């Protein structure tokens, strides 16, 4: 039985334990994870007690047949798809399924009961296979090259958006399907914006510049952040940079199987707080990375998830002082048998 069918088998076992007649998978990353297909116009996997089938609109049929590891059926109208659900009383669904679609399933397919299946899919996706890790490593390699290119491109007078355009082009030239998210090039006062997507602001001498980017490669993501100074850093910039670097390094060193996401977040957060900047670290320490750039676990002060070998997460502490500037240092890391391994490897010292 191949790996895709092993995933279906685990879902069927979950169905048996929870008295679910069938499971409907509609979220694009989950459709790809289970079937190996990624229909642009969307698709639905219907898993019953004996089989799994991918249903796609007619225009996606030929491509889906080439990609899918499970049988594929096509439909012209949604009513044709609803017929495949006839006789099903209890249906497992993802929490992301739109309310309107659920109402249609009640009306058109006469579904009486809906049960959430997010946990079983999340528990499978949260541990990466060797194949997945190799793909993510390549995505990280592309991101590393892009960060170095950004550092070279950043000069006084250049627009943030110009730098972003260059590095996004480079990522595609190096094999990325596209950026994992809108590239952040945030300079000067904008570096204090954690999600300061590249703008028309011109970079100035003395600016802190936060570079946050990622590459999507063969459906998997990477994520990296580095912060530089244009010209020579002042004492305040050096101070907050060294604090963030200390917190980031300590968290990476502490990441290992058995520690909780909450404990890991606290390690970095406490270091920043001890230096008096706790109020300026206003987001979680990190997040899982895989088919989605933000997925489980949430490496936050509220997440009790126990880290396990094979998880891929980010470690990204920051200090953001409004109207002055900010610093963030982020790596994508792999939880290994005895610790962790940085998958993004660009130098972390202040440039």
Curated annotation (Swiss-Prot):
What do we know about how this protein assembles, alone or with others?
A: Homodimer.
Entry keyword annotation includes Metal-binding:
yes
**InterPro entries given for it?**
Creatin/AminoP/Spt16_N, Creatinase/aminopeptidase-like, Creatinase_N, Pept_M24, Pept_M24_MAP, Peptidase_M24B, Peptidase_M24B_aminopep-P_CS, Prolidase_arc
Q: What class of enzyme is it?
A: hydrolase
* UniProt keywords, alphabetically: Cobalt, Cytoplasm, Dipeptidase, Hydrolase, Metal-binding, Metalloprotease, Protease
Question: What is the annotated localization of this protein?
Answer: Cytoplasm
Main localization category: cytoplasm
Q: What does this protein do?
A: Splits dipeptides with a prolyl in the C-terminal position and a nonpolar amino acid at the N-terminal position.
Q: What is its EC number?
A: 3.4.13.9
Could you give one GO CC term from the UniProt record? cytoplasm
Q: Which GO terms describe its molecular function?
A: metal ion binding; metallopeptidase activity; proline dipeptidase activity
- Which Pfam families does the record cross-reference, listed alphabetically? Creatinase_N, Peptidase_M24
Supply the name of the protein: Xaa-Pro dipeptidase
User: Where does the chain bind Co(2+) 2?
Assistant: 212, 223, 330
- Any binding details for the cofactor? Binds 2 cobalt ions per subunit.
**What cofactors does this protein use?**
Co(2+)
Q: Which organism is it from?
A: Pyrococcus horikoshii (strain ATCC 700860 / DSM 12428 / JCM 9974 / NBRC 100139 / OT-3)
Can you cite a GO biological process for this protein? proteolysis
Indicate which residues the UniProt annotation says bind Co(2+) 1.
223, 287, 316, 330
- Family of the protein in this entry: Belongs to the peptidase M24B family. Archaeal-type prolidase subfamily.
PANTHER family to which the protein is assigned, alphabetical: AMINOPEPTIDASE, XAA-PRO AMINOPEPTIDASE P-RELATED
Catalysis: reaction(s) = Xaa-L-Pro dipeptide + H2O = an L-alpha-amino acid + L-proline
């Amino acid at each position: 039985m191949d790996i895709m069918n092993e995933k279906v088998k685990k879902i069927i076992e979950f169905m048996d334990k929870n008295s679910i007649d069938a499971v409907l998978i509609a979220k694009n990353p989950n459709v790809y994870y289970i079937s190996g297909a990624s229909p642009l116009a969307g698709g639905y996997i219907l898993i019953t007690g004996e089989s799994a089938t991918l249903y796609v609109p007619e225009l996606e049929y030929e491509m889906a047949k080439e990609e899918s590891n499970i049988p594929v059926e096509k439909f012209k109208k949604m009513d044709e798809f609803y017929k495949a659900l006839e006789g099903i009383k209890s249906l497992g669904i993802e929490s992301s399924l739109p309310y309107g679609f659920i109402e249609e399933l009640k009306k058109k397919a006469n579904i009486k009961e809906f049960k959430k299946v997010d946990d079983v899919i999340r528990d499978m996706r949260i541990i990466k296979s060797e194949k997945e890790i190799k793909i993510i490593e390549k995505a990280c390699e592309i991101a590393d090259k892009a960060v170095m290119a950004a550092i070279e491109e950043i000069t006084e007078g250049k627009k943030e958006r110009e730098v972003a355009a260059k590095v996004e082009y480079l990522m595609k030239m190096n094999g990325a399907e596209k950026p994992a998210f809108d590239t952040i090039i945030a300079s000067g006062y904008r570096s204090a914006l954690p999600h300061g997507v590249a703008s028309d602001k011109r970079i100035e001498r003395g600016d802190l510049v936060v570079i946050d980017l990622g590459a999507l490669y063969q459906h998997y993501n990477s994520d990296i952040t580095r912060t530089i100074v244009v010209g020579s850093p002042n004492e305040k910039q050096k101070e907050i940079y060294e604090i963030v670097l200390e917190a980031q390094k300590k968290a990476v060193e502490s990441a290992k199987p058995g520690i909780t996401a909450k404990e890991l977040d606290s390690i970095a957060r406490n270091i920043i707080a001890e230096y008096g900047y706790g109020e300026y670290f206003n987001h979680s320490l990190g997040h899982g990375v895989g088919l989605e750039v933000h997925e489980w676990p949430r490496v936050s002060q509220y997440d009790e998830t126990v880290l396990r070998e094979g998880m891929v997460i980010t470690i990204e502490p920051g200090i953001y002082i409004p109207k002055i500037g900010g610093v963030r240092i982020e790596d994508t890391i792999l939880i290994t048998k005895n610790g962790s391994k940085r998958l993004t490897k660009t130098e972390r010292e202040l440039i």
